Structure formats: C-alpha cells, structure tokens
Amino acid sequence: MTSSDQSPSHDVFVYGSFQEPAVVNLILECAPVMVSAQLHGYHLYRLKGRLHPCISPSDNGLINGKILTGLTDSQLESLDMIEGTEYVRKTVEVVLTDTLEKKQVETIVWANKDDPNMYGEWDFEEWKRLHMEKFIEAATKFMEWKKNPNGRSREEFEKFVQDDSSPASA
C-alpha cells in the first residue's frame, strides 16, 4: 500500500467555476466523480472585481453545486491553494439531488461574511459565456506556477482572476 492509499479521501461540495469539469480536471489533474447536490443555508454571491463567486451563510439560501468525491489530500491542497486565504474550509451537510440523501462534506466558504464586495447572485451560465475562457487560462497559469514558482508570488496569479470588464475594478 502506498501512503496515498492510507490517507482518507475527501468529498468536497463545489459551486461556481468549480462546477465546470474543464476547470476541475485542470486543477486536480484528473476527472473526479461529480455528483449533483444542494447546500441549504448559504447564498452564492458575486464578488466585485472577481471572476469567481463566494458563499456565505444565509438563512434562506440554497446553492446548487457538485460534490467532488474521493479527493486526495494533495488534491484538496490544490483547491485550497487556488482559492487562497480569503476562503476557509468547513464541513457542511448537503442533500444529493438524485436521491435526497444527506451527506457531510467539506466546502470552501468566504472568510469575511460581512465583506462589502459580496453582492447579488452569481450566475454559472453567464460565467461560462463571459468568463470561463479567461478563468481556465488563469487556472493553467496557476498550475504552472504551483509546479515551478520561479520566484513569482501568488499575487501574480491573482491578477489573472480579476474581472477587468467591470467598472468596479477600474
């Protein structure tokens, strides 16, 4: 048995850009099993000047997303790295869309629940149309950086996930 066989696997609820298989496959360097699920008690917000959303607790919130099943510690670390320090990982209960079974999983929540940059509702289809190509380019650059930082900082990567089309980022 290898050391990776001994590590527990992780099931992670993802939303936003991580629902897109092309993004997940690039970041995790594989195609994990994805299961549709809903997270109650959270809202999916837009973030001013960003290509990606965040979630934060909300009494009446409901988020449709996916569970990435069986992730390794290394894959979970890749998700954490690309999200950065503005997010925190939490254990939440989701409901599987097909079976209505409840399941405890991990997800990534925006650390500052009072952030004034959170607004409205993030739209996956709009993101795919307007921003997916740029986000995949940014994720590719992130993976290159992760493999060989070459003196570059994480902040250089973060510039790629800024939404330069919005007036708020000007």
From Swiss-Prot:
Residues 147-170 are annotated as: Disordered. One of its GO terms (cellular component) is cytosol. The active site is at E83 (proton acceptor). Disulfide bonds: none annotated. Belongs to the gamma-glutamylcyclotransferase family. It comes from Arabidopsis thaliana (Mouse-ear cress). Keywords: Acyltransferase, Transferase. InterPro entries: AIG2-like, AIG2-like_dom, GGCT-like, GGCT-like_sf. This is Protein AIG2 A. It holds the Pfam family GGACT. Its EC number is 2.3.2.-. Residues 147-162 have a biased composition (Basic and acidic residues). GO terms for biological process: response to bacterium.
